[in-house]
């Protein structure tokens, strides 16, 4: 990547010409041109960045959300605490989420988005782009400290699903998860995320009987739709 290229060349220069190394920063500053680019909005700025950076790694939605969280927690004097929490959350998501597109963190934000949409009473089958959803009201959702807490709780729930945690789930619930894991699309993960966030108790646990009944219903619903109305768009409507 670009960073490694410059790092390796600077290291090589330092080892070969140690006495000249002190002049390198001045040399760079005297031969660099900084070109400021003004944009009307953050979306425009991001499009410009993506165009200029099309040979590098593009910014993910989660990168944008991280920046908003960072500003929020910095104002609260909790910058270091946030950095540690975010790093831990990223590592957790990389272990348990393997999306076809986007990043593991994007997947977590998508599952959480469905919960927030449900709380807001949004029943439209048209789902907004992830970034569009979270940027509403100047990223108000990401300026709520409780949002990060809920994201962590949701990620830990899916970690236990991934690990088939027998202390958290009964065998019959784990069997339902096994069947759903072979569903033709991932919509069931959004249903389950909404159910969990809405019905968990103070310890983050679910009533086994009610949860099992719910899983039975969505299993029948999803697999029936897969036969009669194949396609994820049909399932959304």
Residue map of PLM features:
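Flexible coil/loop and intrinsically disordered segments
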Residues: 1-237
């Amino acid at each position: 990547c670009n960073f490694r290229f410059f790092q390796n060349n600077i290291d090589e220069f330092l080892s070969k010409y140690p006495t000249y190394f002190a002049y390198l920063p001045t040399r760079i500053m005297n031969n660099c041109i900084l070109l400021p680019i003004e944009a009307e909005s953050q979306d425009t700025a991001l499009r410009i960045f993506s165009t200029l950076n099309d040979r590098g790694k593009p910014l993910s939605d989660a990168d944008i959300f991280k920046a908003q969280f960072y500003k929020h927690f910095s104002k609260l004097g909790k910058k270091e605490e946030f950095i540690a929490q975010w790093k831990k959350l990223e590592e957790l998501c990389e272990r348990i989420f393997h999306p076809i597109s986007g990043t593991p963190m994007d997947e977590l934000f998508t599952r959480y988005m469905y919960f927030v949409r449900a709380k807001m009473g949004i029943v439209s089958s048209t789902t907004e782009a992830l970034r569009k959803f979270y940027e509403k009201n100047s990223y108000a959702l990401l300026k709520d400290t409780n949002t990060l807490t809920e994201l962590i709780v949701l990620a830990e729930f899916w970690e236990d699903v991934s690990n088939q945690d027998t202390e958290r789930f009964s065998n019959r619930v784990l069997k339902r998860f096994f069947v759903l894991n072979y569903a033709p699309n991932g919509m069931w993960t959004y249903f389950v995320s909404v159910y969990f966030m809405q019905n968990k108790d103070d310890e983050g646990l679910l009533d086994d009987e009610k949860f099992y009944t719910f899983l039975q219903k969505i299993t029948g619903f999803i697999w029936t739709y897969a036969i009669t109305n194949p396609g994820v768009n049909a399932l959304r409507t």
